From Swiss-Prot:
GO terms for cellular component: host cell endoplasmic reticulum-Golgi intermediate compartment membrane; membrane; viral envelope; virion membrane. This is Spike glycoprotein. S1 attaches the virion to the cell membrane by interacting with cell receptors, initiating the infection. InterPro entries: CoV_S1_C (IPR043607). Keywords: Cleavage on pair of basic residues, Fusion of virus membrane with host endosomal membrane, Fusion of virus membrane with host membrane, Glycoprotein, Host membrane, Host-virus interaction, Membrane, Viral attachment to host cell, Viral envelope protein, Viral penetration into host cytoplasm, Virion, Virulence, Virus endocytosis by host, Virus entry into host cell.
Amino acid sequence: NLFGNNSYVYYYQSAFRPPDGWHLHGGAYEVVNVSTEFSNAGTTGCTAGAIYWSKNFSAASVAMTAPQNGMSWSTQEFCTAHCNFTDFVVFVTHCYKSGHGFCPLTGLIPQNYIRISAMKNSSLFYNLTVAVTKYPRFKSLQCVNNMTSVYLNGDLVFTSNETKDVSAAGVHFKAGGPITYKVMREVKALAYFVNGTAQDVILCDGSPTGLLACQYNTGNFSDGFYPFTNSSLVKEKFIVYRESSVNTTLELTNFTFSNVSNATPNTGGVQTIQLYQTITAQSGYYNLNFSFLSSFIYKASDYMYGSYHPRCKFRLETINNGLWFNSLSVSLGYGPIQGGCKQSVFENRATCCYAYSYNGPSLCKGVYRGELTKSFECGLLVFVTKTDGSRIQIRNEPLTLTQHNYNNITLDRCVEYNIYGRVGQGFITNVTNYAINYNYLADGGMAILDTSGAIDIFVVQGEYGLNYYKVNPCEDVNQQFVVSGGKLVGILTSRNETGSQPLENQFYIKIINGTRRSRR
């Protein structure tokens, strides 16, 4: 029934004619999401012979239904409905107009006829023209992934040998709505056939009725108890940490510069200044030790004399104060304090240059044309080549990162867990009120193990003391359905759940209208 928002549809091939009785078969589609739309056309009407409106989906099936009396094939009501299977689009439309701009996809369609077409890469590869006497009004269009089937008013009007999910669908209309969009998932179904026709259908959807019928492959049960298993779909995961916080100290690479004895003076120009102790930093954290500079005198920039570092807003003595770089290279050189730094920067030997005096001899040659043979005081030149960024940090101490761990424990449902490094699946319950002080707890006094080595009970430090939790199997091996009067009326389980009633050493959960009460 496409007109029920909480219902399903069931399709089976016409050649599928099993003997009378219950048969497990695919082809059922269950509604999982419903939305409505009242109009998406302009004031003058909708545009026929074109696809103008679409909604994105990723679904096994999408059904688009009009009100039960349907919509007329008119630009004042319905124009086009389509199913998009990613590689191609199937649509139904009408268009009794001629002239430029009309019927862009189909061309003129005769009056009192509709067109069902399929289009791939803007080219039509399937066309079916049908008289409106067969479909007097538009009532529904359903897109189904199985064989990319399309149903108009419940009739199969298109199919292919491909199976693809529905990626988009839509109805372009002016009035007569609303259009209801029903997104569906594919489920197996147990169908009861008589003379080759399905008379009753039970969905294998995880409901109590579906679990019972599909496990026993029948919908007819005599009174009694029926054990069953239900494989839980685990959707959640949590971690219980040993420590509330973990400190991680990152590696700090240390490099110490030292004075170079017997360094050779340059012989004229900056290109003859020899480089020493070059360090090129990679990604990470570094400490550069320039303590030997304490015996040198820093020379500030004075026109051509001294240091030159306008692109470096720091001194070498403060470079370890958390400065960030994208690339960094540092070298020592010995050259003339007069012009050595400034000309080195101008000739791209470095980004910045720092000059230091040690009252050295005047054995270094000049760096400017006309001064290449003149002698000047030699000094220590520190060359820095850098680009700004965040790959490299220069700092005094190793960086310590603190990760704070929070134990958010998911209770009363089947979850994947990592408890103090032990992983598995389980149904976690809080047993603090019933716990006793155990003498032996594994994993540093935090967990009790069962005979298989899996966690049975674990303890977590809470705000007001210790909290104890028990790990149960996700599936209750003792659970049984209760059938009375030919109907499913309850479940016997070993778990105490919300709304359950104690029954000797088990609990009874009453089932109303095929559904059960939720767990705590």
